[in-house]
Each structure stands twice: as C-alpha cells, then as structure tokens.
Swiss-Prot record:
This is Proximal tubules-expressed gene protein. The chain crosses the membrane at residues 33-53. Induction: By retinoic acid. Belongs to the PDZK1-interacting protein 1/SMIM24 family. The keyword Transcription does not apply. InterPro entries: PDZK1IP1/SMIM24. It comes from Xenopus laevis. Essential for pronephric tubule development, acting upstream of pax8 and lhx1/lim1 and downstream of retinoic acid signaling to induce pronephric mesoderm to form pronephric tubule-specific cells. Keywords: Developmental protein, Membrane, Transmembrane, Transmembrane helix.
Length: 122
C-alpha cells in the first residue's frame, strides 16, 4: 500500500509534468477593453443589487415600527406629554414639560422608545 509521502510525491510530479506541456492557444480570449467592460458591468450590477436590498431592508424596518401619535412619559410620579413625529422618528418636548417638580433648575430625562436600533453579536 502507498504511504502518504508516496501519494504526495506522485501528485507533485504529475503537476510538474502537466505544467511543462506546450499550450497552443496562449492568446487572450477577450480583448482588454472587453474585459474591462465586463468587469465594470458586473460591478455596477452588484452595486444595484446592494442598493435594492438596502431599500427593501429599510422599507421593512420602517413598516415594523408601531408608534403612537402621542406618547405619555411618566417620571417620578409626574406625567408629561410629548408628541412623536412618525416621519422623522424623534420625540419633541418643550422645556417646561421636562422641568423637574422637585427642583427649579433640574430636568427630567424622558424615556424614548426607539425600535429602530439594530444590534448584532460581536
């Protein structure tokens, strides 16, 4: 039975024998300008595929967000009303709504719900 060393020796010598053969058709299959044109077309097609995939991904994530027009924020027993705009996905509050009832120079931190955050395992 052949050992592993004999098999590797035969494979290496066969590779050397095949590489020494004369190739009659040594010219290029395509001219250089056509090779560049094909490469550019493939690149632009891949960019288009990535762009369309990103557009569908963003559309799907925007449809999955369910926010109310008005959210109620409760902090330290006080109730504050903030309007949420759906198109820009941010909550706008007046400064008087954020003032703390405990101290005149202190402000409350409202809870902001953001379902659009994507996280991945590292």
């Amino acid at each position: 039975m052949f050992s592993l060393q004999h098999v590797l020796l035969i494979l290496i010598s066969l590779g050397q024998v095949y590489s020494q053969q004369v190739h009659h058709n040594a010219g290029r299959k395509f001219p250089q300008w056509l090779t560049g044109l094909i490469a550019m077309t493939v690149f632009l097609f891949l960019v288009l595929v990535v762009y369309v995939a990103k557009m569908f991904w963003d559309k799907r994530s925007q449809e999955s967000i369910n926010m109310k027009d008005i959210e109620e924020v409760v902090a330290n027993g006080t109730s504050e009303c903030c309007e949420a705009r759906k198109e820009n996905q941010y909550i706008s509050c007046n400064m008087k709504d954020l003032r703390s009832s405990e101290h005149i120079h202190a402000y409350e931190n409202p809870i902001e719900v953001n379902d659009n955050v994507r996280s991945t395992a590292m």
